[in-house]
Amino acid sequence: MAKSNEIKAVLTSPIISNNPITLQILGICSALAVTSKLENAVVMTVAVLFVTAFSNFFISTIRNYIPNSVRIIVQMAIIASLVIVVDQFLRAYAFSISKQLSVYVGLIITNCIVMGRAEAFAMKNKPIASFMDGVGNGLGYGVILILVGAFRELFGSGSLYGFVILPLTSNGGWYQSNGLLLLAPSAFFIVGGIIWAVRTMRPDQVEPKE
């Protein structure tokens, strides 16, 4: 029972109480760049979740055989291999989304969340716990991406996942789209607003004053 509770805590903690974006301020670049559409945000979420979970699992499995002097190189090799798998899969089965995500799929290799969990958790814990930690951090990252992507697409173009929700005036509807929300700077303010909201509701996440 205790072990089950530990696994549950590892899985759920990164989603709210220890979210990699709202608390640790990691993975911000892709959160700004790929959230102009909900579809892109969902695909990036799945990609990061897959890479984080399986890189944690594989690194944890061989952690006792990795020389300390080359551990970062080994971690990056495993992460890069998984990113290549994701990139080739998207090119084969979702080419249009792959083109929209552009270099940001490849840049998962350098995502602070992926590297951070490999070094801080997978190198010190067993494979199953490490896998669940990767899933949890991928979900925590994805929750923010999906919130930002949904907000930007809905109020920026009046649609969600390509389906019209707010009919645009240009098409005879009533909603005047806000083009600013489709630009990357808007994501910066939305993410900032989410961080503010989370820390207002959870004062324990506010950094102490110096």
Curated annotation (Swiss-Prot):
Q: What is its EC number?
A: 7.2.1.1
Give its localization. Answer: Cell inner membrane
Q: Which InterPro entries match?
A: NqrD, NqrDE/RnfAE
What is the reaction catalyzed?
Answer: a ubiquinone + n Na(+)(in) + NADH + H(+) = a ubiquinol + n Na(+)(out) + NAD(+)
Membrane association type: Multi-pass membrane protein
What is a single Pfam family found in this protein's UniProt entry?
Answer: Rnf-Nqr
Kindly list the GO molecular function terms attached to this UniProt entry: oxidoreductase activity, acting on NAD(P)H, quinone or similar compound as acceptor
Q: Which GO terms describe its biological process?
A: sodium ion transport
Superkingdom in the source lineage:
Bacteria
- Where exactly are the transmembrane stretches of this chain? 42-62, 66-86, 103-123, 131-151, 154-174, 178-198
Task: List cellular component terms (GO).
Answer: plasma membrane
Q: Which UniProt keywords apply?
A: Cell inner membrane, Cell membrane, Ion transport, Membrane, NAD, Sodium, Sodium transport, Translocase, Transmembrane, Transmembrane helix, Transport, Ubiquinone
Ion transport found in the keyword field:
yes
Summarize subunit and interaction data from the UniProt record for this chain.
Answer: Composed of six subunits; NqrA, NqrB, NqrC, NqrD, NqrE and NqrF.
Q: Which family does it belong to?
A: Belongs to the NqrDE/RnfAE family.
Q: What does this protein do?
A: NQR complex catalyzes the reduction of ubiquinone-1 to ubiquinol by two successive reactions, coupled with the transport of Na(+) ions from the cytoplasm to the periplasm. NqrA to NqrE are probably involved in the second step, the conversion of ubisemiquinone to ubiquinol.
**Name of the protein this chain belongs to:** Na(+)-translocating NADH-quinone reductase subunit D
